[in-house]
């Protein structure tokens, strides 16, 4: 949720008027906004029951989004190391996550994200589906770099009873009862 709101706030602050969805400038703005939102996610977010110092109000504010946009070069990608030398890695995309969005003829919508975390998940099958091993989404300890290249940030360090950070954001948007967007 926080990442999506941050990206939308940045896109609103930067303006998309006159840009087509396939233009280089449009795609550049979306990519740079996403990179900054995910950087803040990695740096600040974790289970809020265990992290009382998450600056969520600031991260979701339009003013903060405007500062992110102001620091973005509109003509070239920002170096990942310049954005967050302490937490940026290049792992590529996970092949174990599936997402689908469906809208039927009557406008009923479904948005579903299912992830295993790694190949074959936990290795346990129940009632016809695989159980995931999302424990891998926790950071092992602050500063620890996993074999996947994840760098541990304190808000998402593993602890009993804690919920791990997740990027899944299946979304359905309606305005005045009418479906507007499904992602």
PLM regions: where:
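Internal maturation/activation junctions in enzymes
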Residues: 13-115, 124-126, 136, 142-143, ...
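Flexible, polar/acidic helix-loop-strand segments at domain edges
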Residues: 2
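Short alpha-helix boundary/capping segments
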Residues: 22-25, 160, 183
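Active-site rim segments in enzyme catalytic domains, especially the processed small/beta chain
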Residues: 108-175, 179-181
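Protein kinase glycine-rich loop
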Residues: 6
């Amino acid at each position: 949720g926080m990442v999506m709101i941050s990206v939308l706030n940045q896109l609103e602050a930067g303006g998309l008027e006159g840009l087509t969805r396939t233009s280089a400038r449009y795609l550049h703005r979306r990519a740079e906004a996403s990179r900054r939102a995910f950087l803040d996610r990695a740096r600040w977010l974790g289970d809020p029951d265990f992290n009382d110092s998450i600056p969520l109000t600031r991260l979701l504010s339009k003013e903060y989004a405007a500062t992110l946009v102001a620091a973005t070069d509109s003509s070239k990608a920002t170096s990942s190391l310049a954005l967050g030398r302490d937490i940026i890695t290049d792992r590529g995309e996970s092949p174990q996550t599936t997402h689908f969005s469906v809208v039927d003829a009557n406008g009923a919508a479904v948005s579903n994200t299912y992830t295993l975390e790694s190949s074959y998940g936990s290795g346990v099958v129940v009632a016809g589906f695989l159980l995931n091993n999302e424990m891998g989404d926790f950071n092992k300890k602050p500063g620890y770099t996993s074999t996947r290249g994840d760098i541990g940030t304190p808000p998402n360090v593993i602890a009993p009873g804690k919920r791990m950070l997740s990027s899944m954001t299946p979304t359905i948007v309606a305005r005045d009862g009418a479906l507007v967007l499904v992602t």
